[in-house]
C-alpha cells in the first residue's frame, strides 16, 4: 500500500460513512468505496519539477480506505489512466504529437468526450473499432488493445494489479469487435479501484 493507515483519518472516514448511511439508509454497505489520502506539510505537490519521481514517491502519505480494493466500473474516470498512458507514449516517442491528438487529449479531459477518448485509445493501442473479426486477427487485436494494461502493470504498483483499462468509453455502448471484446457478460469492461485512482 502506498499510504500509511492513520487512526485519525480512520475515525473521520468511518464517521463520514456512518453519516452517509444515516442520511441515505437505502445505500447498501457494498455500494460505496472510498480512498482518502493526505500529503502532510511540506506537501510534495506543485513543486514545478523540483522533486524527482523517486523523491515524490518516498514522501510519506497518510490515508484511509473503505473497500478501496473493490473493482468498480469507472465510467469516465478511466480517462485519467489513458491521459497518463498517452503522455508516456508521447514522452518516449512511441507516438508523435499532432494537432488532432492534442485536441483529442484536451477534449477527453476537459469535456469528457467519448469521441475524443476513442481516438486516444486508437493511438495508444494501434487498434480501431469496426465489424467483428475472424478468430486469428481478433486475438491479435485483443492483445494490442491490452497494451495500456501491460504498461500499467509494468509500473509495479500493487494498486494497479487488478484494474482493467482497455475499453473505449461509449454513449450508446459498443458495437462490432468492441462489443465482442467486452465479453458476453460484460466481464471485460473497464474496472478501477478507489485505491488505484488515489495512487494515480
Q: Language-model segments: what does each one mean?
A:
Residues 4-38, 100-195:
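Active-site-adjacent helix/loop patches that line small-molecule binding or acyl-intermediate pockets
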Residues 12, 56-64, 83-86, 98, ...:
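A generic structural signal for ordered alpha-helices
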Residues 30, 37-71, 87, 91:
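Short, conserved catalytic-motif segment at the N-terminal edge
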Residues 47-49, 81, 175:
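Surface-exposed beta-strand edges and their flanking turn/coil or helix-capping segments
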Residues 72-95, 108:
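Active-site SXXK
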Residues 82-86, 120, 197-200:
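Buried hydrophobic packing segments
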Amino acid at each position: 500500500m502506498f499510504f500509511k493507515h492513520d487512526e485519525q483519518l480512520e475515525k473521520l472516514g468511518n464517521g463520514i460513512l456512518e453519516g452517509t448511511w444515516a442520511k441515505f439508509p437505502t445505500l447498501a454497505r457494498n455500494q460505496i468505496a472510498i480512498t482518502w489520502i493526505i500529503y502532510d506539510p511540506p506537501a510534495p505537490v506543485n513543486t514545478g519539477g523540483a522533486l524527482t519521481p523517486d523523491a515524490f514517491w518516498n514522501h510519506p502519505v497518510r490515508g484511509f480506505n473503505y473497500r478501496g480494493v473493490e473493482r468498480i466500473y469507472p465510467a469516465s474516470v478511466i480517462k485519467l489512466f489513458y491521459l497518463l498512458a498517452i503522455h508516456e507514449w508521447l514522452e518516449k516517442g512511441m507516438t508523435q504529437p499532432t494537432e488532432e491528438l492534442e485536441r483529442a487529449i484536451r477534449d477527453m479531459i476537459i469535456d469528457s468526450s467519448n469521441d475524443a477518448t476513442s481516438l486516444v485509445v486508437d493511438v495508444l493501442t494501434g487498434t480501431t473499432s469496426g465489424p467483428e473479426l475472424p478468430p486469428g486477427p481478433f486475438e491479435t487485436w485483443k492483445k494490442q488493445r491490452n497494451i495500456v494494461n501491460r504498461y500499467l502493470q509494468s509500473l509495479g504498483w500493487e494498486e494497479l494489479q487488478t484494474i482493467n483499462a482497455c475499453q473505449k468509453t461509449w454513449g450508446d455502448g459498443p458495437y462490432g469487435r468492441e462489443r465482442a471484446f467486452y465479453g458476453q457478460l460484460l466481464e471485460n469492461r473497464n474496472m478501477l479501484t478507489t485505491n488505484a485512482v488515489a495512487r494515480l
